Amino acid sequence: MQKFEFFEHTADIGIRAYGRNLNEAFENAAVAVFEVMTDTSKVEPKEMREVKIDGYDLENLLYRWIESLLVYYDSEIMLFSKFYVNIDEKNLTLEGKAWGEKFDPNKHERRTVVKAMTYHEMKIENKGNYYILTFVVDI
């Protein structure tokens, strides 16, 4: 199963992330967002950051997960390439970890900066044996 794909969207970037379960789909969504910004295969998992959030529904958890990671990028210039997510669907909480390193222009390709997560076209689909997360990021 592919981890993610991009789709055309006027002035922004659409992402479809896939996973065998909801946690994996959220992890792959994060990889996709950082792949927009750089080649994540060149981002070493040297430092770890934690994210603990709650939401009012799964879409809000997805929004807040990506938003939290972008805050680390904006405040520390952190790029991430490895993620761990544990979602409690009953209580709508997410505990996640992201591993990466600070942006180094000599090592990391500078692609398009993701400015923000959006709710535009957001959809979380449970297909029985896999999940599809669809969303758009502002660039």
Curated annotation (Swiss-Prot):
Gene Ontology biological process terms in this record: tRNA splicing, via endonucleolytic cleavage and ligation
Residues that, per the record, bind Ca(2+)? D12, D138, I139
State the InterPro entries in the record: Archease, Archease_arc, Archease_dom, Archease_dom_sf
Which Gene3D superfamilies does UniProt cross-reference here? Answer: Archease domain (3.55.10.10)
Q: Which organism is it from?
A: Sulfurisphaera tokodaii (strain DSM 16993 / JCM 10545 / NBRC 100140 / 7)
Q: Provide this UniProt record's keywords sorted from A to Z.
A: Calcium, Metal-binding, tRNA processing
State the protein's name.
Answer: Protein archease
Q: Which domain of life is it from?
A: Archaea
**Record-linked Pfam families:** Archease
Its biological purpose: Activates the tRNA-splicing ligase complex by facilitating the enzymatic turnover of catalytic subunit RtcB. Acts by promoting the guanylylation of RtcB, a key intermediate step in tRNA ligation. Can also alter the NTP specificity of RtcB such that ATP, dGTP or ITP is used efficiently.
Q: Which family does it belong to?
A: Belongs to the archease family.
Q: Which GO terms describe its molecular function?
A: calcium ion binding
